């Protein structure tokens, strides 16, 4: 029996990226820098989150020409983003042959009621989450990989830390629940009880959970790995820094060797300025991308 497109295959593809760094790129040149630095995959888009935030307006799926340019430039997997709920954008990316689709809050949501039914696709999906309720709902919809939402395009790690800690704390709580407590918790979280039962049985999420949204330095990446991340997405942090090549290599090394503090200290020397960050407290509620999705 062919397993193409099954949860087993799609989750297995995501597992292969575990321990690695996935970098946002906007052209072939950046994609080659990411691959040379050791990225396990790249996310092809027209603008990094910091530029999307600055430009405002409606952010949509990237021009397929940009995505194909990146796909032709590198041998590592290529991801691309679609708007939340935009089934047709996802079908277009699947037709292009991308390796993963990110149903992303970085783009302007297309549907304020429904996320994409990811079970209908052969290509695996990655989705963001802030808590176990969001994580479980995305898994039930067919997500093969999760990531913290953080606050994209800010260079501020605080929200990614908050989301990773919250998900892991809620997992620990679920693991110790009785069946009746589990049913009540599912109702409280708005989560399918079947997914919570699987989490309880495994003692963890059934899919990998990467850190994303605010990673800007090697130390940020190492911190998220310490908190239990399975890997790291870096959006604006690399190509909005003063020295993208150095930052890319340093973040990859810090993610792999996140317990080697002497190495991280060495990696952090002479990098040049990190991307200019934003204090989350200064963002108006309507400018907080993490609030998108349900």
Swiss-Prot record:
Its EC number is 4.3.3.6. D-ribose 5-phosphate binds at residues 24, 153, 214, 235-236. PROSITE patterns: PDXS_SNZ_1, PDXS_SNZ_2. GO terms for molecular function: pyridoxal 5'-phosphate synthase (glutamine hydrolysing) activity. D-glyceraldehyde 3-phosphate binds at residue 165. CDD domains: pdxS. Transmembrane segments: none annotated. The keyword Nucleus does not apply. Signal peptide: none annotated. The keyword Lyase applies. Pfam families: SOR_SNZ (PF01680). One of its GO terms (biological process) is pyridoxine biosynthetic process. It catalyses: aldehydo-D-ribose 5-phosphate + D-glyceraldehyde 3-phosphate + L-glutamine = pyridoxal 5'-phosphate + L-glutamate + phosphate + 3 H2O + H(+). The active site is at residue 81. InterPro entries: Aldolase_TIM, PdxS/SNZ, PdxS/SNZ_N, RibuloseP-bd_barrel. It comes from the Bacteria. Keywords: Lyase, Pyridoxal phosphate, Schiff base. Pathway: Cofactor biosynthesis; pyridoxal 5'-phosphate biosynthesis. Homohexamer and homododecamer. In the presence of PdxT, forms a dodecamer of heterodimers. PANTHER family: PYRIDOXAL 5'-PHOSPHATE SYNTHASE SUBUNIT SNZ1-RELATED. Belongs to the PdxS/SNZ family. Catalyzes the formation of pyridoxal 5'-phosphate from ribose 5-phosphate (RBP), glyceraldehyde 3-phosphate (G3P) and ammonia. The ammonia is provided by the PdxT subunit. Can also use ribulose 5-phosphate and dihydroxyacetone phosphate as substrates, resulting from enzyme-catalyzed isomerization of RBP and G3P, respectively. This is Pyridoxal 5'-phosphate synthase subunit PdxS. The gene is pdxS.
